Amino acid sequence: MSKRKMITAALPYANGPVHIGHLAGVYIPADVYARFQRRMGKDVAFICGSDEHGIPITIRAKKEGVTPQDVVDKYHEIIKKSFEDLGISFDEYSRTTSKKHYEVSQEFFLKMYHNGDFIEEVSEQYFDEQAGEFLADRYIVGTCPKCSNDGAYGDQCEKCGSTLSPTELINPKSALSGNVPVLKETKNWYLPLNKYENFLTEWIIKGHKDDWKPNVYGQVKSWLNDGLKPRAMTRDLNWGVPVPLLNAEGKVLYVWFDAPIGYISFTQEWAEKNGKNWKDYWQNENCDLVHFIGKDNIVFHCIIFPSMMKAHGEYIMPQNVPAFEFLNLENDKISTSRNWAVWAHDYVADFPGQQDVLRYALLSSAPETKDNNFTWKDFQTKNNSELVGIFGNFINRVAVLIHKYYNGEIPQGTPSEEIKEISKTATEIREFLEKYEFRNALSSLMNLARFGNQYLQTEEPWKTIKDSPEKTAQSLYIGAQIAVALAQMCEPFMPFSSDKLLKMFNVEKLQWIDLEKETELVSAGHKINESSLLFSKIEDDVIEAQIQKLEQTKQNNKKTNPNANPMKEQINFDDFAKIDLRTATILEAEKVEKADKLLKFKVDTGVDIRTVVSGIAESFTPEECIGKQVMILLNLAPRKIRGIESQGMLLLTTKPDGKLSFVTPDDKIENGVEIG
């Protein structure tokens, strides 16, 4: 096994914050592995960064009326801070809009281009003549041919889940202008993945059947069995890394071409800052490359990126790609579009100082081989029963008793059979983590805390102190060894708690191999610091507040307009029948003196001509209103406004920008026509 470890975590997409699904399925396991490998004495480079190109970012930018750069700048900072707050120990966290990344991506493309690794193909793609640009799949909307959903995209119908191509849509329209797009020829550069089928079969199917996860191996095997096809490595877009060819204006590198190259460019940035040679981590067979990803990225990291590196010719292949399945939330699929998620930055704000509780809860439910579920009640139980009741309880008992009986000094004792439990646990954790079995590794850690509690219950040092003080000393000496072992071993999983414990017991961090030796970890006479509670109980009302937050999200998702106000008190039909709504035309309009918001109208209701005062002057000038056909509540009791008797109410609604809009008939009709 190599001394050097190149560990990457999938680049989070900078069109929104990270949530617990991302954390459980990629970033916390990757961090545990990186921290563990450092403790094993390995030369580790743990690399990640924000993926800042692609269609979803441009779509969000258009929706928000800002530039794509504005979008990625905002979310890059939110994501980066979330990782820092949760103790994700990246050696480098960069971004794909960096100058270095553009240079490295373009150099990579040119090397393959000059090697003759691409094929040029001309295809027909939808083009928006008004916007003057080719449309990516997500910029084409229409009716789904499978379920008749009118809001299907060019790549997928989110209602029925069908995968689509733009030409399958019924009545396709451009999401940019609303116009019907035309098919237009365009040239792009394709990577003939079929050329690498034999290489991928030899490397993965024959070479990694026994040591790669079944979900990863099975998905790769399925892709290869179906036969690989050429895939475009360039796109007709104006946001991304420009294709570095003279005849490629208006084209950028495919986001899944440039994004994985980010691992390389970010490593180069890190190496330059730290006096390292980046090639030692990417072009040296004595380095183990490991990609941590979610299952939706398997094809990119096990087929496309390895094919790119093979074509380039100078890069090592991954030793492993431990892809995780998905984490659900309260028995429902996490969805960013539906806001059905627990966002990392929200958790940090709502649970200050409790980062390790989330790390522990997510690791213990990590979706290693199948989808798993997170619930707030389970989160509470894991904290209260396991972290407080078992782990924290043992640590506290040992520290308090040592201070009470021995003035904070480790009492005299000798290593006994119980010490073997420490070395056994350290070995178990190492073996589990080397196989990417994070849940089992965490269970071993907690089992050592359980063992410590059982040991204290059996020895009862609080009772033996009077009659057998030497027995009390021995039991608390052993208790201290177990407590220090927990402080050392919990660091990859719960780094904040480990830091507190190492300070509490006044010890330095050890290499992992030292924990596997059957020797004492702290000597008699060693002075420990004052104890403090490691974890605190989470009360029901705190959890209920989080559940209610999700319930509110669920209610909002039932609305077609999440910003709509709740329905008012229900009325019966007789009440409705009393309302007299009519069509009417505004004949005259003028501002009301000394009233910035009021306009005075003379309105032809078909029944009569009357005066109406309305507070809409901030949305309309008087001139805009004259001649407009509107709808009026005719039988509303008159009331005086600024001394003017208003005889009715005009119907208006509020647009997304906050401006008012008249409710009007589709076509001009007679005044006085009843509505209802």
Predicted regions: what they are:
Residues 557-676:
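Phosphate-backbone binding interfaces of nucleic-acid-interacting proteins
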Residues 2-75, 92-110, 114, 131, ...:
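N-terminal catalytic cores of NTP/NDP-binding nucleotidyl/phosphoryl-transfer enzymes
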Residues 501-575:
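Intrinsic disorder at enzyme termini
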Residues 116-188:
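Cys/His-rich short segments
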Residues 378-414, 421-527, 633:
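Helix-rich, typically C-terminal accessory recognition domains appended to large enzymatic cores
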Residues 2-48, 100-104, 147, 156, ...:
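Structured secondary-structure scaffolds
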Residues 77-91:
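A glycine-rich helix N-cap at a beta->alpha junction
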Residues 319-323, 502-504, 600:
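Beta-strand segments within the central parallel beta-sheet cores of soluble alpha/beta enzyme folds
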